[in-house]
Structure formats: structure tokens, C-alpha cells
Amino acid sequence: MTRTEILSNGHAEPASNGMVQYPFDNVVDALRAAANTTEGIIAYQTNNSGSETTPAQHISYKELLRTAEANAALLQSKHLTTPKQPVVVHSDNAVDSMIWYWSVLLTGAIPTMTGPGMFSQDAVERKKHLLHLHRTLDAPLCLTRRALMGPFNENAGLLQCLAFEDLSPSPDGSNASLPPSINPSPMDVAALMLTSGSSGTAKAVPITHQQVLAALRGKTAVAQLSHPTSPFLSWVHMDHVANLVHCHLFAIVAGVSQVQVPAANVLVDPMQLLNLLSRHRVSRTFAPNFLFAKLRRQFDAGRTDSLDADLNLAALYLDTGGEANVIDVCAGLQPILARYGAPADVFKPSFGMTETCAGCIFNSHCPSYDQARLHEFASLGTPMPGVRMRISRLDGSGEAAPGERGHLEITGEAIFHGYYNNPTATADAFTADGWFRTGDLAYIDAGGHLHLDGRTKEMVNINGVKYLPHELDAALEQAEIPGATPTYFCCFGTRTAAMDTEVVAVLYLPAYDEADDAARFDAQSSIIRLISMYTHSRPRVVPLRREDMPKTTLGKLSRAKLQAALEAGQFAAYEAANEAAIRRHRDTMRGEPASAEEATILSIIREQLEIPEADDFGVTDSILSMGATSMDLVAIMQRVNRQLQLRKTLALTDMLNYATARGLCQRIAATSGTGRKHVYDPVVVLQPHGRKTPLWLVHPGVGEVLVFVNLAHHITDRPVYAFRAKGFNAAEGETPFTSLEEVFETYKAAMKARQPQGPYAIAGYSFGGMVAFEIAKRLEAEGDEVRYCGSWNLPPHIKWRMKQLLWDECIIHLFYFVDLMDEETAYTHKPKLCELERQGRRLEAVRYLRQHSNPARWDELGLSEEYYLLWVNLASNMQGMATEYEPSGNVKHLDVFVADPLTHVARTREEWVNGLLAAWKDFVREGVRYHHVEGAHYTMLKPEYVANFAKTLRTVLRERGV
């Protein structure tokens, strides 16, 4: 390697052969060098409000180093870290991840980067994952925010957790000490990265300083950036090498700035990615094929209003990977981006893994190379300097010939040397002569370019996120879907060139009559909703005959054979017949747009949820029934607000309460004063499908139904309705309830209007448990049968607690109930809130608490400060009506779901049940059943607990005969 000239900023200049020689041999010294420049980090906050700009935090590399040094000194002074021992850094945002990555590294410990995505929705899997980390990393310390501690606290003792908030250096410097002096060797570990999140057993990959710098030298040599001093940008989470190594460390080592953007900002509106690339003159960023496909569709549809007028992409170098790139997408987008100055062959498909520090094999000529050879999918190019690849024959007899399919193996300085504390996995991962087995099947074409051609493992890869098929099978089994035969589900990933990414194919054996279109529709809708919730994608569902799904002598379906048969077209006739039957049924339900506004909103919904034209989704179909995620709801909300230029914009709660194109249109008309007079309807339809007895849910004291949305996705066999309190639409003249009797009678009347005959099933969460009891009591008094009445973590005697819930308590409860802050943090603000409330400054109290809330969650909810004030006042009014409530009378039976009590109410579950919940026995004729569920009073329906909660609920409903 020729000698390079070291620039005055301490960074290296490319030599004549394209390689660089850095003046440091570890990333700590790289940060110290970067701290002597004026470069730094531009970190954006989550934007879900619909505006085109979001606030950004500017942190120079000098400030990053100083903050990390102060934190490291504090960690060392408290003896919290040990040199060369892992410390888990668990964060949901880039700023925390960066600061605490360096804080841990500067103590000499090994930062292990994780995020909320590593946790399964299944409690058993979460515990298994944490136990595995406990063993693999030798009981590591975990640093995180209080708001993210839930999964760790539910498995207390596996990992010692400390909150970032409790570790920040004192403003007065009282806990300050000298910054640590650390000089890592090249072979020291710079980070531990996990190979998988919630699926499978995670392997910890040690990435050394030498490996990082070798990888960055190779990446730099391949790219030959036209604007080498321009910033890098990432919207990927920091627990992925595509950000930590390929952007964050890369930018620091290169001595350039970096832009960190939350994924939601890009995924909600991909056009904003182009705007950010232009505004910051970004040279290097990463995006997968599905995002390019979304961009192309937006351009093709002419939806470019949000693009900057002076868009300039001249500096751009687009790394892409994680899934195969469709050449038609790249070729279609290339001339569009070129109009804004993007260079030819702007797409750089690559092959990379955690074990290779992200991309290590690059195609520098996409789409031209692959267009000339008529490829459907982009090739992955050739190895960067310092890396070699080979294809080994499937029979193990040696190296494959060009074009011959085999096992991809790689070696080189940028490749890791083995998994942390896992000798078995390490032995399996390397050949006898030391080459790394990637686990991919591939071939090399005549031009020397790599092509992937399948995987030796069964992972489903959707938008770069991997899922285990057997976990999806299990989720479908657990859901007990009407119309589907138990043990006859088979999930796998499949893809054609026309698809942006892999999709989950679900093959199942129907339990309905072939001519029953309604039952077929309900079964398919349930499958779609469930898989969409787990994978954030719409599955391909195909019902088969029993003879098409033979089982082995051990009772197993052959996933490989069924996948091969589907992809060979053997089930095409069944799929076509199924689609025709679904269309027939939808034709009987479909609602056509009655106005231009309805047509616009329907079009936005169809585009966001990518509902095919063949699917007759109409204006009366619920967004929620299509498996829409919270991100989908936010995206639809933003686009409707923007395209219809609404004076009073929609909020996230509107998306839930008016979840059809027609409902949203009526909501807009009501709030703008142009529609018919608003009429309060207490019923929110969370899940319209299924033939079993409907489940009615009563809101907690906050009056809203947001808490039930995740649960409704898991209830597939019956309609799910929820009651929403009166008074939220104050602008339309809607006034709050004035008495509990009005609440009981209003909800009972609405219930009878939708379901005139029993048997009935009703449950209430917290405060709603009391309301459910009173409604059930009235129904029984009128001769109706109530087979299921549920109180979810509420005792019968509540007036003492209601008297404690003054206005300041209500605002505290609301803010941690909707995840704006955790309970412990919320209560630290009680004195200030009491002071503001005494002064009659309630709106100021909301604004004060907002300053201490999670800004990303605030934006996601999309509500104004004034709306929160209305909400708190309604909650206070609702609970104030119960200060003199005394239970009386009785119901036939009651099921009490028991979660951890509020800390202000009881210390333990035993005390909670025996001291307070047991009093229900005086108001139930045939006995009370208690069912313990995971989580605490305000968390038992959160994503990490809701799957098992739903499983318990389904069991109880079955036992009660509904």
C-alpha cells in the first residue's frame, strides 16, 4: 500500500490505489481525531405530525467525546463496568445509542448494542432470549431508559438494569471525576452485535477495532466517492451494523458529519428521505429494495408535492442490500433520480452480514450491468479489497464452476473470527481452512459477479427483517381461527420479480364448506390480520385440500415441498378459486365512494396498505381489519391532512374511532362544520369479523379505547366492540356524561342496538370493570344472559381510590397510560403539577409535562396540548363521578384478570388479591374466578404481554361457553 498523506484534521487521504491508511489503529482514537474537527451529528426527532420539517439536534464530535468521557468516568467511579466485559446498551433512538456506546467503550468494557426490536411478543420467548443473553454475556449490566425497562423487569434477576436518567453526571459536577484514559489495541472488541432479534437464538458477534478499520478501508476503496467530505446518513437503528459500522463509525473515521434519522420519518413518506439527502448534500446512505419500490410508485403516481423544489442528488451513492433488488425497480428509478443530478448507476447492491461489518461485496454498476444481461434481480458484484469469496459445491467436492450453485464462503480482514462465548456456533460457521460459511446458496456469473440463489435456512426475509416460519405457524395455531383446521398451517417466504420484498405465504386446511364464501372470507381476514401484526406485511393466503398437505409419520408438514409446489404453480387453480370466492363475498359488502373526498381517502388507504386492485376494499371497510400498523395509521393520517388541506387536522385517535374512508370523511365534515350535525356514538368497532358472540370492552378511566387495539388483533373468532366516553368531540357540542347512571344506560342501549339478543360477553379494564359489572347486572335484571363478565384488575370497592384521583393524579396517569413517560418519572413531577393546578394553570401543566415526555411518542399520537387538556378533564370528570360509588346487587359469575397492582394501592399480588379483589365474592352468585396475567396495571395490554393475555382471554371465553 502506498504511503498516504495525513490531513491536518487527523484523518487519511486516499492513496493512488484507492486504499487509505489511517493514522490510528482503533475507533477511540478515530473519535479523538474527529473531535478536533468541526464535524458532528445531526439527529432528527421522529416526525409523525404531517409537517415536512422536524427538529434536529446538533452534536459535534467534540461534544460527543466530552459527554462520553464524563459518563465513562461516572461508570468507573461507581465500579459498574469491568474491562473487556460486555455491557448491554438498550435504546430506541440514535442519540442515546451513540452516547452510551462511547460511554461504555471508554471504560474499557464492550458495548453490546440492542433495541426494542430484539424482543418477541411472546413472554416465554422474551424470557428465553434474556436467559440466553445472561448466559452468553455472563450476566451483563444493561443500560437503558426507564421507559424501556419493562421486558427486563418482568424477568428480574437475569440482567441488572440501570437507567440512563440515573447515570447522567450532575450539572454541578459533584459526581465528576477524571475522564478515563483508554488506548485499545487493534484486536480488542469495539462492539458486540447480535445476529438476530426476536427470532431464533441470538449469536453475539465480536467486532474488533482492526476489523472495523479494515472494512472501512475496503468500502472506501470501492466507492471512490465524488464528494468524499459530504455527510453520511442513516435511518437504520443503531443495533444494526448498517448504522453502527456502516454510518456512525464510518463517518467518524472518515472525518465527515453524519445525519441520523428515525426510521418512521423515512418509512411514512420516502420522499422525505430524498429531501434530507439533498438538504445535507449526503454522499452515502443505505436503503433496501422495498423503499426504492415505494419511491418509484410515488413518482409514477405523481405524488411529488412534498419534494423540495431545489432537490440536488449530485453527491449521492446509494448502498442497498438486506434483500434482493429488482432490476425493473432500479432501472425505473435511475432516470428519475438522474433528473435531480444523481450519477449513473447510483444503486450499489451489496452482500453483507453482521459478521462482515455490513457490505463487503459490491456491485458498482447497477442497473447497467444487470440490464445488459437481462437479470430479474441485481447481482451483488465483487469483493472489496481485503475480502475474498468462493462457491463450494453442494456435495462438498471442491469449488464450484462459474454459474454453478453452491455454498457462499468468504474470508478476509473484515470478516469476524468467531462468535462470543459460543464455540459450537463458531465451529459450525467456519470451514476446515478457515473460510466463513454465510449460510447462503449462490453462484458467480461469467463476469465475476455474485448472485444469491436461496438460503440454507428457512428464515423469511421481509423488508430486511427476518422471521422464523415456525413462530408464525405457532401464532396462527394459538389464535384458534374459525374456519381453519388446527395443526394444518404452513408459513414460508416467497417472492417473484414483481414483488418489492418477500411475502409470507400461508397455506392452510379449511374447516368450512367450500361454498361458504363468508366463512372463507372471515378465515382469510383473520389470518391476514394476525400475520400483518407480526410482520407488518400482508401475507399471501392459499387454502388447500387435505391431500395436498400430507403429514409425515411424525405428524409434520414438509415446508420445503409445499413451498416448491406453490412456486411451481401447482396450487395456482386453488389460489385463483379462492380469490374469486373472496371477490364474490366482498361484492356483497363493498361500499363505493359517495364524494370526491371519500374517493381521495380511499385511494390513500389503498396505496398505504398496498391493497391490490383485485381486492375490492371499499369505503365502509375498516382499516384495522386489513392489519394496519400504527405506522400505517400515522401515514394515512398525514396524507389525508396534507392532500385535503384540512383546517382541523385528523389525530391518531380519529384513525381508530372512524377507521373507514367514509367514517373519516364524516369526521372531517363534522369538525369543519360542513357535515350533518354530530351525533355521539359510544361504540368503536375494533374487529368486525367472526361468528362467535361479540366481545364488548369498556374503557378505563381515561375514557379512550387505544389500549384495546393490540388486543383486538389477537381476537379473530368474534367481533370486538369497545365503548368510548362522551365529551371528546367538544368542538361539535358533545358534552361529558353527568352521572354514572347515564354511562351505564347509554352503553347498555348501544350494546342492545348492535346485539339485540344474548348471550353477552363484556369486560372492563380498570375503571371499566365497574361499568361492565353494572351493565351485566342490568342485562340480567332484564332477563338477558351474560355468560362472561370480566373485571380486569379492579376491585368492587373503589370510591376511596377515586377520591385520591385529583386532577394532578389524572394527568400523571394519562401520560404514562399512553406511554409518554414511565410511572416513576411521572410521579416525580407531581409537586409542580399540583402547584400549577392550584393556580388554575392546567394548560401550562400539560405543557410542562410535555417537556419531560417522549417526543417521538407525542408526535406519533398526533394530539395537541389542548386535546390532552380536554382528555385529562374528561378523565377527571369520569372518575369524579365514582367518588360515592357503592357496589350493590350481583351477577351470575365474574372473571377477574389479575396484574401487578399500582404501587400506591398494594405492595404485592397476594396483598392485592386477598385484600381487595377478593371482595368481589359478595357480588357474584356462582363464584369468582381469578386469572393471573403478565405485566402491571397499566402495562398488561402492551405489545410484550398482549399475546398471552389474549390466549388467557380466549380460554376463559371458551370455558364460559361463548
Swiss-Prot record:
> Where would I find the Carrier domain in this sequence?
595-672
User: Which top EC class is given?
Assistant: transferase
Pathway where this protein functions: Secondary metabolite biosynthesis
**Pfam family name, one:** Thioesterase
Quote the SUPFAM superfamilies the UniProt record gives.
Answer: Acetyl-CoA synthetase-like, ACP-like, alpha/beta-Hydrolases
GO MF annotations, alphabetized: CoA-ligase activity; transferase activity
* PROSITE patterns in alphabetical order: AMP_BINDING, CARRIER
GO BP annotation list: biosynthetic process
- What is seen without this gene? Abbolishes the production of asterriquinone CT5.
Query: What residue spans carry the region label Thioesterase (TE) domain?
Result: 694-951
Source taxon at top rank: Eukaryota
Q: Give the function comment from the record.
A: Nonribosomal peptide synthetase; part of the gene cluster that mediates the biosynthesis of asterriquinone CT5, a natural product that displays potential biological activities including antitumor and insulin mimic activities. The nonribosomal peptide synthetase atqA is responsible for the production of the benzoquinone derivative didemethylasterriquinone D (DDAQ D), via condensation of 2 indole pyruvic acid (IPA) molecules. The symmetric connectivity of the 2 IPA molecules is thought to arise by head-to-tail dual Claisen condensations catalyzed by the TE domain of atqA.
Task: Kindly give the PANTHER family that the UniProt entry links to this protein.
Answer: BCDNA.GH02901, LONG-CHAIN-FATTY-ACID--COA LIGASE
| Family of the protein in this entry | Belongs to the NRP synthetase family.
Spell out the protein name for this chain. Answer: Nonribosomal peptide synthetase atqA
